[in-house]
Amino acid sequence: MKHEDIAVIKRNNGYNCAQAVLCAYAEELGMDEKQLFALSEGFGSGLGCTLGTCGALNAACMIQSAMLSTCHLDHPDSKASTYPKIRNLLKAFEKNVGALRCRDIKGIETGNVLCECEDCVRIACRLVDEMVFDKKGE
């Protein structure tokens, strides 16, 4: 089953967008789904329901960061190479969705919904598959 389909099922079962995306990659991350679920709980509805950065996008950034980090705690050395890749992910998400913030995506101020939450979850997963795991359409 595709990650995007797994994530949508999780979202339909009550996970927030960040939880749905992050937990869909538990196996690839080598992490426990319960821990990922807890870690991403506060990222729903644009960070704690503030309508800030989309939760699905935040989760995608967490996945990419986890895969790129060298985890050298005594000498953090991978930030410089990770940040540009995160920026590329942000640009790709914005190109596909039309915005980065939940407020703008949901059209809170304009009344113009750019993308439904389920589609944001799907797009975030597709971008992770393509940009992090180099899998197109799998």
Predicted feature locations:
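Phosphate-handling active-site elements
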Residues: 28-38, 66-85
